[in-house]
């Protein structure tokens, strides 16, 4: 079975129907997130650093993070049709979490550069945005019981 055909069959089985927007989203994901090997780690869960990678963390994103945003937007287009499907909701939240994690890595690099250049106003602004992003991610993850502590 060809990979394209396998994905179509898998998605129809997972969501209970075929959906063009969902298929576009997963096509993007398999060509970006799932096409890369390695140990990419979110700046949120990595050991604190101002660097993209060191002995403890590798936060250099191995794909274009804008593509994951596009995939999330495609998934969101299916909300009216698939919103009650638990697998769809799970995947929607997980891809959204990845979008936020990727953005956190970008912000982390900004405030790392702010620290190196001693730009206190920018460092304060970007580090605050990083902390707010953690709250946003926590709020998103809290919308599905599979991501709640104790479940």
How would you name each of these model-derived features?
Residues 1-151:
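Substrate-binding groove of N-acetylhexosamine-processing glycoside hydrolases
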């Amino acid at each position: 079975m060809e990979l394209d055909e396998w994905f179509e069959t898998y998605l129809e089985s997972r969501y209970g129907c075929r959906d063009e927007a969902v298929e576009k989203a997963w096509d993007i994901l398999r060509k970006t997130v799932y096409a890369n090997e390695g140990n990419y780690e979110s700046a949120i869960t990595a050991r604190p650093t101002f660097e993209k990678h060191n002995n403890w963390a590798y936060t250099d994103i191995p794909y274009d993070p804008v593509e994951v945003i596009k995939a999330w937007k495609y998934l969101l287009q299916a909300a009216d049709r698939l919103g009650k499907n638990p697998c769809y909701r799970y995947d929607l939240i997980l891809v959204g979490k990845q979008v936020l994690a990727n953005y956190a890595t970008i912000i982390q690099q900004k405030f790392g550069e702010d620290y190196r250049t001693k730009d206190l106003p920018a460092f304060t602004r970007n580090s605050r945005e990083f902390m707010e992003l953690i709250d946003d991610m926590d709020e998103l993850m809290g919308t599905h019981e599979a991501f709640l502590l104790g479940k």
